[in-house]
């Protein structure tokens, strides 16, 4: 994929993601070891990563959803990101079920779990961030954590609508729009995503929200 993006001449910032724990949707065959993930990520960074501003390829690392992984691999992810000076990406507060899982198992909200595990700050950016309460909204702003809203995917999965006006008012500066992935959206058009984001926010938060 990285070679194909280079050949096409498009900007591509891939993330070496992983699953470290089996579940109903994660069979044992796709579970990665810490050594395998970190070794592969370092290989990709050394081969393709260009740290310069506006570069065409910057390689990152990150779990799909951090609190579904082992704490050991999350810690190793942060350590490697600091060592190689690369970004960390994943999903945060996408669904109500996700919030309920974190509250039940860890006794806190999703963004607070991320804070406790050093997963917020300039190095980090997360997709969705729908089900954040007021304190979490401010936490994202105070830590300068990046957010990427994925409205088409969120509508397909009935996940909800990202609180974009509240996040911007709170002071979130690193804000973008994403398409999520083929498993949750059948469109990879950024222009369509921008159009839908505008309409969804007007529907969700009012005609003066964007």
Predicted regions and their residues:
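Long hydrophobic segments that form regular secondary structure
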Residues: 132, 136-144, 150-156
């Amino acid at each position: 994929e990285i070679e194909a993006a280079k050949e096409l001449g498009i900007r591509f910032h891939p993330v070496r993601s992983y699953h470290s724990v089996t579940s109903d949707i994660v069979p044992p065959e796709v579970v990665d070891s810490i050594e395998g993930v970190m070794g592969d990520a370092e290989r990709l960074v050394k081969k393709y990563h260009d740290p310069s501003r506006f570069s065409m390829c910057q390689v990152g690392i990150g779990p799909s959803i951090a609190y579904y992984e082992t704490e050991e691999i999350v810690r190793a992810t942060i350590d490697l990101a600091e060592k190689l000076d690369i970004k960390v990406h994943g999903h945060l507060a996408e669904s109500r079920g996700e919030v309920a899982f974190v509250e039940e198992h860890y006794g806190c909200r999703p963004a607070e779990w991320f804070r406790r595990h050093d997963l917020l700050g300039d190095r980090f950016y997360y997709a969705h961030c729908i089900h954040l309460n007021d304190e979490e909204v401010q936490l994202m702003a105070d830590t300068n954590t990046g957010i990427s809203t994925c409205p088409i995917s969120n509508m397909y999965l009935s996940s909800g609508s990202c609180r974009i006006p509240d996040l911007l008012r709170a002071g979130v500066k690193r804000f973008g729009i994403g398409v999520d992935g083929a498993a949750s959206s059948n469109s990879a058009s950024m222009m369509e995503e921008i159009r839908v984001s505008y309409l969804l926010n007007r529907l969700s938060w009012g005609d003066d929200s964007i």
